[in-house]
């Protein structure tokens, strides 16, 4: 495991040839100054980028209109769907589906027993959500937004599941409580612990053959 960036990383976004991430650049009068960097795999270079590149990667072509509808576009979770629509999740559990024109077509909540969803991921025509405070994953029908399946709960294999990353027919769950990556097969629903770290795992992404985790101390290549 190799540390590639030291400090508080907010979010990592995969690109076709690397990753983009947002991070805490400085704290001034108790307010965080956010910076953005891009790593290009071909040459290994780190490049400072402007927030418009970050927003385009996160929200798609209509990023300006989408970002204006977010209370905080750094903490907002998003999925750009194949049809150009954008699904958004706020920290308070508010969820919205925006059309390709960034006009809201559905608004609701992703909550389970009073717990707010912490991350979302797309698999086929289903939306998966993690609930860190309840140690569960829920599957929703993306058309009806009805809950279809639950994994976890009592004697849960998860411990504060904070991040989701779909890879093939599996989803990698980042557990901030147990400091483990847990793999869930989305066809058989089998679960096993994939890897353990010395710090809480906030996020996992894989781009090509490169796997990254965000820990409290920074961004790592594993």
Predicted regions: what is each one?
Residues 6-16, 50-54, 65-82, 113-124, ...:
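Repeated scaffold domains used in trafficking and secretory/extracellular systems
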Residues 24-45:
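Short, conserved, GDST-rich strand-edge loop motifs in beta-rich repeat architectures
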Residues 21-26, 80-81, 88-92, 129-135, ...:
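Conserved beta-strand positions in repeat-built beta-propeller and related beta-rich domains
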């Amino acid at each position: 495991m190799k540390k590639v960036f030291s400090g508080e990383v907010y979010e990592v976004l995969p690109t076709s040839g690397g990753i983009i991430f947002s991070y805490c650049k400085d704290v001034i009068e108790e307010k965080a100054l956010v910076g953005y960097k891009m790593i290009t795999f071909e040459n290994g270079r780190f490049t400072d980028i402007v927030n418009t590149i970050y927003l385009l990667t996160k929200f798609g072509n209509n990023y300006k209109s989408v970002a204006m509808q977010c209370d905080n576009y750094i903490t907002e979770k998003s999925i750009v769907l194949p049809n150009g629509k954008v699904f958004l999740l706020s920290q308070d559990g508010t969820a919205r589906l925006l059309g390709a024109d960034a006009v809201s077509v559905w608004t609701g909540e992703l909550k389970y027993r009073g717990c707010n969803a912490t991350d979302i991921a797309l698999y086929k025509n289903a939306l998966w959500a993690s609930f860190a405070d309840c140690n569960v994953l829920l599957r929703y029908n993306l058309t009806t937004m009805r809950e279809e399946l639950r994994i976890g709960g009592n004697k849960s294999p998860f411990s504060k599941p904070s991040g989701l990353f779909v890879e093939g027919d599996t989803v990698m769950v980042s557990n901030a409580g147990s400091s483990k990556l847990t793999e869930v097969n989305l066809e058989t629903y089998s679960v096993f612990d994939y890897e353990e770290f010395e710090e809480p795992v906030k996020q996992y992404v894989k781009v090509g053959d490169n796997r990254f985790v965000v820990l409290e101390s920074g961004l790592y290549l594993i």
